[in-house]
Curated annotation (Swiss-Prot):
Entries under NCBIfam families matching the protein: PPR
Region (Type DYW motif): 603-697
Keyword Aminoacyl-tRNA synthetase part of the UniProt annotation: no
Transit peptide residue numbers: 1-36
Name this polypeptide is given: Pentatricopeptide repeat-containing protein At5g46460, mitochondrial
GO annotation, biological process: RNA modification
Region Type E(+) motif, residue ranges: 574-602
GO MF term set: RNA binding; zinc ion binding
Length: 697
């Protein structure tokens, strides 16, 4: 317009007027450029979540148009500042359907469904986006029936509306309704297919998810990378290894291999199929800078019990400046727990603190478990206290950790705090508390708790694990008849673990007859239970019935049943050192250390407890067999290779025997160091000649 006017003035040589028009044109152009610059600046601030800076620039705009108001409202709701968004919405001089939709969607995102309904009712004109936002809001509020009503009231439905309804059904486990609706959809896009495939897999119908993917390919739907992440996960869950390989080939063909979540899904797929080497090959295809890919490989190593490799991946992430996320810490700390390596765990804890994740429930829970499993329950409690929003998993983790370490009183104090804060306990909470009663000999407290859990305010149906704990409590306290009667009265069918708890108590209290009955019940459930054979053999050996021991060993050999070999390990400077019972010392220094300790212990009056050597041989042979139990080898190695005065932490795969328990108590006094031993039952903290279990384990 301005250029035409200037041309006309030049044509008639009206130079002065053309100068005026040029000035007006320049000022108008300057205002437009300034407005555009401010709009770009506002968008940049909103993108970086600098909402207050965006508002400052917004306030400098003379007459913001509707779209700029809408952008600010969206920015507020994405930052969970709903009140500010509503105030700005009220200030708008003019509103269009987009601004109404943005405000309604913001209320839904912020969880204020009442305000969303109020705005929806006040809308002068509704679009399909308005209806879809309300359907999503109903699903977010758990109002499935209301979502259905709104969906069927919609005057016009687009593909996004259908997709929202299908996704909502799948979210609430209404898979058949979702499938029915999916088939009725007039026009399915790739999002529709992806939603249905992922939903089927997440609802444990992975086979159907794979069939649907095949249909999608037959329909020649132009795919994005998103469906492939779901399909690969479904292949792992189905399991469908060969189809997974075919999908891998298709991913390469379509050029999706190097996309972050596709690579991560492939790594996870091969790891779940126990092909961790193939996971590594996928990872090594290129240099990855995405945390999801690194985390997938770390988790894969952890899943396949290659914990040292998992920790090596964590180190690699830090070297390559890849910042770990919550999932990374969960998998990495799980590997620390499995190895019992406190040094690695503390290093990860330090990284979590630097990233501000120590108080995050997901990371905090993993830290609590790691410290508990690594023998440091005090630090576990410290971490638990710092968790900002404690979930039921947080409470259960610390209660179970206290139980493992024989801190029964602590467990019940924490349970009391949990009840006072109106946190509802679940079945795992009661399993942890009953376990604490078992380890600490709290017979009456265990009885009351067992009764309370099924009849108190927080009613919990007793599960098999609760009965197992209660049988263990009674058995350890010598109430074998009562334990047997409890099994007979169980409302659920007793499994092998319940009978093993009774059989273990029979071994502890040398009750041969009841032990034979418990073993017979186990053999009816599992004729090849090596644990039952070993416990029954121990009962016979303690009673001096060597002929019965021989018969059992012949039967085990005939049926191909192998006794689990005893092993213990220590982790020093990030490396696991494992020892097996009966090993000759790995080096002369271990042999010398063991002999030195044997002489010192004999000076203190130590005499071997031959009942722990369950073989019909001479006493000298029994002493040698006992002296080279795996935990003693591991302790000697730890004493040699750690700093004088520091604690030695040893992990063992079998329950510690009575003689080893006595020996380790004495060693802790001789060397003046704390020795922490974790067996499958609990933790033992040996210090100054005593054990934290009080000789009750």
């Amino acid at each position: 317009m301005w250029s035409r006017a200037i041309f006309q003035r030049f044509r008639f040589r009206a130079f002065s007027i053309s100068h005026v028009i040029h000035g007006k044109c320049y000022r108008s152009f300057s205002v437009t450029v300034e407005f555009q610059n401010r709009e770009v600046l506002i968008c940049n601030h909103l993108l970086s979540r600098r909402i207050d800076e965006a508002r400052e620039v917004f306030n400098q705009v003379p007459s913001p148009h509707v779209s700029l108001y809408t952008k600010m409202i969206t920015g507020y709701t994405r930052s969970n500042r709903l009140v500010d968004a509503l105030n700005l919405f009220d200030e708008m001089p003019v509103r269009d359907v987009v601004s109404w939709n943005s405000m309604i969607s913001g209320c839904v995102e912020c969880g204020d469904m009442n305000t969303a309904v109020k705005l929806f009712d006040e809308m002068p004109e509704r679009s399909v986006v308005s209806w879809t936002a309300m359907v999503n809001g109903c699903f977010r509020s758990g109002k499935v029936d209301q979502a259905e009503r709104l969906f069927y009231q919609m005057p016009v439905k687009d593909t996004a509306a259908w997709n929202s309804m299908v996704h909502g059904y799948l979210q609430f486990g209404k898979v058949d309704d979702a499938l029915k609706l999916f088939k009725q959809m007039p026009g399915k896009n790739v999002i529709s297919w992806t939603t249905m495939i992922c939903g089927l897999d997440q609802n444990e119908r992975s086979g159907e998810a794979l069939d649907l993917f095949k249909n999608m390919l037959r329909c020649c739907i132009k795919s994005t990378s998103r469906p492939f992440t779901c399909v690969i996960t479904a292949c792992a869950n189905a399991p469908a290894f060969h189809m997974g390989i075919q999908v891998h080939g298709l991913i390469i063909k379509l050029g999706f291999l190097y996309e972050e979540y596709v690579s991560a899904s492939l790594i996870t797929f091969y790891a779940n199929c126990k092909r961790i080497g193939d996971s590594r090959k996928v990872f090594d295809e290129k240099v990855h800078e995405q945390v999801a890919v690194w985390t997938a490989l770390l988790s894969g190593y952890s899943l396949n019990k290659k914990h040292e490799d998992a920790l090596s991946i964590f180190s690699g992430m830090l070297r390559n400046s890849i910042l770990p996320n919550q999932s990374t810490f969960a998998s990495g700390l799980n590997s620390c727990s499995a190895l019992g390596t406190l040094d690695w765990g503390k290093e990860m804890h330090g990284v979590a603190v630097k990233l501000g994740l120590e108080t995050d429930a997901f990371v905090g829970n993993s830290l609590v478990v790691m410290y508990s499993d690594s023998g440091n329950v005090n630090d576990a409690v410290s971490v638990f206290i710092k968790i900002f929003k404690k979930s039921i998993v947080s409470w259960n983790s610390i209660i179970v950790g206290c139980a493992q370490h024989g801190r029964g009183k602590w467990a019940f104090v924490i349970f009391g705090q949990m009840i006072r804060l109106n946190k509802e306990p679940d079945e795992i909470t009661f399993t942890g508390l009953l376990s604490a009663c078992s380890h600490c000999g709290f017979l009456e407290k265990g009885r009351k708790l067992f009764y309370y859990m099924s009849s108190g305010i927080n009613h919990i149906d007793r599960k098999i694990q609760h009965y197992t704990c209660m049988v263990d409590i009674l058995g350890r306290c010598g109430k074998l008849k009562e334990a047997e009667e409890l099994i007979e009265r169980m409302v659920v069918k007793p499994n092998e673990m319940v009978w093993l708890a009774l059989l273990s108590a029979c071994r502890m209290h040398s009750d041969v007859d009841r032990g034979e009955k418990a073993a017979a019940a186990i053999f009816n459930l599992d004729s090849k239970s090596s644990a039952a054979y070993v416990l029954l053999s121990n009962i016979y050996a303690s009673a001096g019935r060597w002929s019965n021991v021989s018969k059992l060993r012949v039967k085990m050999k005939k049926n191909g049943i192998m006794k689990k070999p005893g092993s213990s390990w220590v982790v020093i400077r990030g490396k696991k050192h494992e020892f097996f019972s009966g090993d000759q010392p790995h080096c002369s220094r271990i042999y010398e250390k063991l002999e030195f300790l044997r002489e010192k212990l004999k000076e203190l009056g130590y005499a071997p407890d031959y009942r722990s050597a369950l073989h019909d041989v001479e006493d000298e042979q029994k002493e040698e067999m006992l002296w080279y139990h795996s935990e003693r080898l591991a302790i000697a190695f730890g004493l040699i290779n750690t700093v004088e005065g520091s604690a030695v932490t040893v992990m063992k795969n079998l329950r510690v025997c009575e003689d080893c328990h006595t020996v380790i108590k004495l060693i802790s006094g001789v060397v003046g160091r704390e020795i922490v031993l974790r067996d499958p039952i609990r933790f033992h903290h040996f210090k100054n000649g005593t054990c934290s279990c009080g000789d009750y384990w």
